[in-house]
Curated annotation (Swiss-Prot):
Keywords from the named record: ATP-binding, Chaperone, Cytoplasm, Hydrolase, Nucleotide-binding
Binding site for ADP: Y23, G49, I50, A51, K52, S53, L54, E196
NCBIfam families in the record: PRK13531.1 (NF010054)
Subunit field text: Homohexamer. Interacts with ViaA.
GO MF, any single term: ATP hydrolysis activity
Top-level taxon in the UniProt lineage: Bacteria
Catalytic activity: ATP + H2O = ADP + phosphate + H(+)
Keyword Cytoplasm: yes
Organism: Shigella flexneri
Enzyme class: hydrolase
Ranges in a coiled coil: none
EC number(s) stated in the UniProt entry for this protein: 3.6.1.-
Activity regulation details: ATPase activity is stimulated by ViaA.
Record-given protein name: Regulatory ATPase RavA
Length: 498
């Protein structure tokens, strides 16, 4: 692929030109452009008067000397109105059944068919052949048709289990459009003086026939990496498990992959990237219910698996668990260990402080911080005499939290290993240790594992940063992926500070 970044820049500028004067239709224009550049079909769903036909007309200007055909279907539409009238001369002179196709669908590069579901069987059958094989049977001859983009539109979906489903399945990209929502865009639309039929694309940006044919071959050379295929397979398996998921044919999956290849190609990449999979949200849905379901499943895939977010969190959880185990082992070694007294005839077990503890005020460190009396506590100061009395006779024990303020009542106990343990209101405990005996910093094993995990996170974030320069992916999706990666990074950094 020659000069991939220049091609990506050119396609971006081409799309910007096509979008001029159209408000809140950038995503639709970009996907229709992608479909046109890869020879696919688009279905636009939405109420009348929202620029569905204008979108199709604009796409004609993406190509040099492209011809367009536009038709509004009715229940009374005939094949002659779409594919051309019969040649009376050929029928009369030579007895040949032949259509005059000039100016009709068989000779158009860009085709727009409005109210598509009102077409009759005679039109539908011929249209299916045109979409599938890019061929048109004209009498005794089979003619190749130049159609690069078919845009079909309607304000309703086809009825389930109808003869229209075969045609609907050929519409790879499906877009649900609505009227202009933003106030500023609505005002701009009302006051715009631009002629909608003017060509907004400079000649230098228009695609030539030679370029189009060459790109079709180069799109097929874009590779599908193993890790991207695994993501697609995960999505397919997940959809198969959901009872309300739409049926997705093998044909649709295969055509969708070519669309992903085209997205990568026109983004300047030589391989499909996880970010391209977001396009599947506009390819796999069938109706309103499945539209939401597909978007949810792809969102989970993108924010949880595509850049190993969930895998990194799982690794982080294992590292944290190992750190806790090491902390517990260290606590057993460094905790303040009391001396058990005989007390054979005593109803309560008695203890005393180790002989090397002689200070009148003892500052004991919590092996892990606890929230006590609405305060994050890391150490507690005890009067030696009060602690000795509690060890001997029990009752109430008080200490200064973090060594400040008045002494507060504490839930203190001696565990089976003769260590002092303080508990919070939820009964979470923390073993107490003398200053200097608590391990400082992260163990080397944990530190190394966290550094390796952070390095992997940086690699994944760098990959996403490189891949997100994709014209065909909405910014809000990229924002959610960035947030998911930043959340993983924040959790790793937090673990490094423990």
């Amino acid at each position: 692929m020659a000069h991939p970044h220049l091609l990506a820049e050119r396609i971006s500028r081409l799309s910007s030109s096509l979008e001029k004067g159209l408000y809140e239709r950038s995503h639709a224009i970009r996907l229709c452009l992608l479909a046109a550049l890869s020879g696919e079909s688009v279905f636009l769903l939405g109420p009348p008067g929202i620029a569905k036909s204008l979108i199709a007309r604009r796409l004609k200007f993406a190509f040099q000397n492209a011809r367009a055909f536009e038709y509004l279907m009715t229940r009374f539409s005939t094949p002659e109105e779409v594919f051309g009238p019969l040649s009376i001369q050929a029928l009369k002179d030579e007895g040949r059944y032949e259509r005059l196709t000039s100016g009709y669908l068989p000779e158009a590069e860009i085709v727009f068919l409005d109210e598509i579901w009102k077409a009759g069987p005679a039109i539908l059958n011929t249209l299916l052949t045109a979409i599938n094989e890019r061929q048109f049977r004209n009498g005794a001859h089979v003619e190749k048709i130049p159609m690069r983009l078919l845009v079909a539109a309607s304000n309703e979906l086809p009825e389930a289990d109808s003869s229209l489903e075969a045609l609907y399945d050929r519409m790879l990209i499906r877009l649900w459009l609505d009227k202009v929502q933003d106030k500023a865009n609505f005002r701009s639309m009302l006051t715009s003086q631009q002629d909608e039929n003017d060509n907004p694309v400079p000649d230098a940006l228009q695609v030539t026939d030679e370029e189009y044919e060459r790109w079709q071959k180069e799109i097929g050379e874009i590779t599908l990496p193993d890790h991207v295929f695994e993501l697609i397979f995960i999505l397919r398996q997940q959809l198969d498990k959901l009872p309300d998921a739409p049926y997705v044919s093998d044909r649709r999956w295969k055509k969708a992959i070519r669309l992903l290849q085209a997205s990568a190609f026109f983004s300047g990449r030589s391989a499909v990237a996880p970010v391209d999979l977001i396009l599947l949200k506009d390819c796999l849905w069938y109706d309103a219910q499945s539209l939401n379901l597909i978007q949810q499943q792809i969102d989970v895939l993108m924010t949880g698996h595509a850049w190993q977010q969930q895998g990194m969190l799982t690794r982080l959880g294992a590292i944290v668990q190992r750190h806790l185990q090491l902390q517990q082992q260290q606590s057993d070694k460094t905790a303040l260990t009391l001396i058990r007294l005989g007390g054979i005839f005593s109803r309560r077990q008695q203890y005393q402080l180790p002989v090397n503890v002689t200070a009148s005020t003892l500052t004991l460190l919590l092996q892990k911080p606890l929230k006590l009396h609405d305060m994050e506590v890391v150490h507690i100061s005890f009067e030696r005499s009060a602690l000795e009395q509690w060890l001997s006779k029990g009752g109430e024990i008080r200490g200064k939290l973090n060594g400040i303020g008045f002494a507060q009542k504490l839930n203190l106990e001696v565990d089976s290993t003769q260590h002092l343990v303080v508990r919070d209101v939820s009964l979470q405990g923390s073993t107490l240790a003398l200053p200097g005996s608590s391990a400082e910093g992260l163990p080397g094993e944990i530190k190394q594992q966290l550094e390796e995990l952070e390095s992997d996170w940086r690699k994944q974030h760098a990959l996403f940063s490189e891949q997100q320069k994709c014209l065909f992916i909405p910014g809000d999706w990229l924002g959610r992926i960035e947030d998911s990666l930043q959340d993983v990074g924040a959790q790793i950094r937090q673990a490094q500070q423990c």
